[in-house]
């Protein structure tokens, strides 16, 4: 989140106090990223730096009592940033954040399986290599 913000012209600042642990995040559930959410959800936070000023074109879609920009989005460019960790067990509905990102925003199909990846890779390699060793 900080790298994207800095790269796109926003400002990152160091917090007076580190935010660590499961924290209530106030979210904008009209965002595609938070579709199906209540207004307040618990997510694991682990950071010292935070986004102080969002880049042009971004809007705030989540904040905590000590982090003014815990989630931001630029729907025109299809860019989303979150300060928290949806992938860990103590983030309530973290899996839903990931699903919303993959299926609603990125439009992934959800039918990918490792065995088809392996089979497709072997087939492509055989076609490329042919009889060469």
Identify the role of each PLM range.
Residues 1-4:
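Local cysteine-cluster metal-coordination motifs and their immediate loop/turn environment
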Residues 6-133:
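RNA-binding accessory domains that recognize and position tRNA/RNA substrates
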């Amino acid at each position: 989140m900080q790298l994207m913000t800095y790269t796109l012209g926003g400002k990152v600042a160091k917090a007076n106090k580190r935010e660590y642990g499961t924290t209530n995040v106030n979210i904008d559930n009209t965002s595609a990223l938070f579709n199906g959410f209540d207004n307040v959800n618990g997510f694991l936070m682990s950071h010292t730096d935070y986004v102080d000023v969002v880049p042009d074109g971004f809007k705030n879609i989540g904040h905590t009592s000590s982090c003014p920009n815990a989630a931001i989005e630029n729907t025109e460019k299809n860019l989303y940033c979150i300060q928290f960790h949806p992938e860990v067990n103590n983030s309530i509905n973290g899996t839903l954040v990931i699903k919303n990102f993959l299926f609603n925003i990125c439009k992934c199909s959800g039918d990918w399986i490792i065995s088809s990846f392996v089979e497709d890779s072997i087939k492509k390699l055989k076609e490329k290599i042919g009889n060469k060793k």
